[in-house]
């Protein structure tokens, strides 16, 4: 992206700007690959969080995904309509809604794995094994920095 420096607020030469651009491109490519198997970006993370087949509360799912409860509620509504998850009130506490991946959703596991393998391959094309390892190490450090731990 070519933005004149005088109009860029001085941010276009920062690493954070580069990360933002890469993140945007990566998410777009993930959306494209997942749409080929009938999913939307983010739904694969829900599948991962529910992969063991057990049910969890919506609050626990939000915590696992690192998102707000309201975000999960909206996402689950459409996923339930698509037959990917089921939701039921907890019999011991009617205030709690339990979520479970349906067999239809769990059956997509291999296709999700393949889509992510393809995304990973495309993302790191042209990098040597050492560069991939170095990138992974650096991204872990950046993630740790942003998590504030």
What are the residue ranges of the model-derived segments?
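Short, locally clustered residues in the helix-turn-helix/winged-helix DNA-binding domain
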Residues: 20, 48-52, 140
């Amino acid at each position: 992206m070519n933005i004149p420096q005088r109009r860029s607020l001085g941010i276009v030469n920062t690493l954070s700007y580069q990360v933002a651009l890469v993140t945007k491109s990566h998410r777009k490519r993930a959306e494209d690959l997942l749409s080929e198997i009938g999913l939307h970006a983010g739904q694969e993370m829900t599948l991962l969080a529910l992969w063991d087949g057990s049910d969890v509360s919506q609050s626990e799912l939000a915590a696992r995904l690192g998102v707000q409860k309201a975000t999960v509620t909206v996402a689950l509504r459409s996923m339930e309509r698509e037959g990917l998850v089921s939701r039921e009130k907890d019999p011991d506490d009617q205030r709690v809604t339990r979520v479970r991946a349906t067999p239809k959703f769990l059956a997509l596991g291999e296709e999700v794995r393949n889509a992510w393998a393809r995304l990973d391959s495309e993302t790191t094309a042209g990098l040597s094994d050492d560069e991939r390892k170095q990138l992974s190490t650096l991204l872990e450090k950046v993630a740790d920095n942003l998590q504030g731990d």
